[in-house]
């Protein structure tokens, strides 16, 4: 934990990680803020259960995240539950229905759409840019984001297959990644080493990928899960300060909450189905304060086509969700956040319209 102490008793502010919650007495705090609160999106997650139990009686609560529901709208329910608005089960019963015969799939009721977003806007706000609150975006516009896809040809068939084919199941996708580690690392290292003056962030998914990348890329330093908190903290600080050029790590370790605007190059050598991890990882460099165009390189084997396609689908769905929430709740959000609403003038005709004779004839 990183405590910021005050001389006034009872007014201390403490900043800490979720995994250190057990070291604190929740009753000693009058307010709690969950940053990167998407960690509570799963209704059965251990983190959500611990936080619900710890801060049930806390007076002031705030959740902040760019991806509150990276998979579907029902995940908004866990945020409502933590904030004390209602339980996720109550939200589902009120606004959602089972979609067909699959009882695990929930669909927003057609007649409840407007009511649902109005309800969400009473306790949540989707603010992506100043114009969402009625302000000018000119000082907030990000530089261009360039995506480069690199496909490694895979000739070796997956287990049980006669010919090489695109992986479909999760186990097949992991097998495909393992079989193409050497080729993907080689292609990535070639590009990273060719830009010796550019700081790079290189993301991996498997330990074997991280180890191989660190060896193949000149000056690369890896942050692994097995490293101590002290080692991770020091290496993160060193990379941000420019003490080494290339950082290799997993999105699950370094993909959230960090600011690396000094880097405009990024590579994904391990691609998973998690759009949230991908989105958050990209945003470490492509964020407010970035002055240059950002280039993202994605390395995947030809057998991982289903993974890349699924990631793109989730990106489209997430964009559509953000657009819908912003459009549906804009007026309510402006009222609750800025105290203003959109003003319109209604025209009430004082005289009846006289239709010209030639229009009557045409009709």
Residue ranges and their predicted role:
Residues 92, 100-176:
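Interdomain helical connector at the RecA1-RecA2 junction of SF1/SF2 helicase-like NTPases
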Residues 201-203, 211-212, 218-254:
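Conserved helicase ATPase core of P-loop NTP-dependent helicases/translocases
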Residues 172, 177-205:
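Conserved interdomain hinge at the start of the Helicase C-terminal
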Residues 7-31:
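Conserved helix/coil segment N-terminal to the catalytic DExD/H
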Residues 273-362:
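A conserved SF2-helicase RecA2
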Residues 9-10, 31, 39-42, 48-132, ...:
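Conserved P-loop NTPase motor "coupling/switch" region that bridges the ATPase
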Residues 28-33, 75-78, 258-271, 294-298:
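A short beta-strand element within the Helicase C-terminal
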């Amino acid at each position: 934990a990183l405590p910021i102490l005050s001389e006034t008793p009872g007014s201390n502010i403490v900043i800490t990680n979720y995994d250190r919650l057990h070291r604190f007495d929740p009753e000693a705090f009058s307010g709690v803020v969950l940053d990167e609160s998407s960690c509570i999106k799963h209704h059965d997650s251990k983190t959500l259960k611990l936080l619900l139990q710890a801060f049930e009686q806390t007076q002031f609560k705030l959740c902040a995240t760019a991806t509150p529901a990276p998979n579907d709208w029902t995940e908004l329910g866990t945020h409502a539950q933590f904030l004390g608005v209602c339980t996720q089960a109550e939200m589902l019963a009120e606004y959602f229905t089972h979609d067909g015969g699959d009882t695990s799939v929930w669909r927003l009721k057609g007649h409840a759409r407007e009511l649902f977003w109005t309800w969400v806007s009473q306790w949540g706000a989707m603010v992506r840019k100043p114009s969402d609150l009625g302000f000018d975006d000119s000082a907030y516009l990000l530089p261009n984001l360039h995506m480069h896809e690199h496909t490694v040809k895979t000739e070796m068939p997956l287990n049980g297959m006669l010919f090489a084919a695109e992986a479909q199941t999760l186990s097949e996708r992991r097998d495909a990644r393992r079989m193409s580690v050497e080729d993907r690392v080689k292609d990535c290292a070639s590009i990273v080493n060719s830009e010796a003056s550019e700081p790079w962030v290189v993301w991996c998914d498997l330990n074997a990928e991280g180890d191989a990348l660190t060896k193949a890329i000149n000056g690369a330093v890896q942050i692994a899960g097995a490293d101590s908190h002290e080692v991770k903290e020091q290496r993160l600080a060193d990379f941000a300060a420019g003490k080494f050029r290339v950082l290799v790590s997993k999105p699950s370790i370094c993909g959230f909450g960090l600011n690396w605007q000094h880097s405009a190059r990024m590579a994904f050598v391990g691609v998973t189905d998690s759009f949230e991890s991908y989105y958050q990882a990209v945003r470490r460099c492509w964020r407010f304060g970035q002055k240059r165009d950002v280039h993202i390189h994605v390395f995947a084997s030809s057998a991982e086509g289903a993974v890349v396609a699924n990631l793109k689908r989730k990106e489209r769905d997430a964009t559509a969700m953000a657009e819908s929430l912003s459009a549906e709740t804009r007026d309510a959000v402006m009222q609750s956040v800025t105290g203003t609403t959109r003003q319109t003038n209604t025209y009430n005709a004082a005289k009846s319209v006289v239709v010209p004779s030639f229009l009557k004839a045409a009709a």
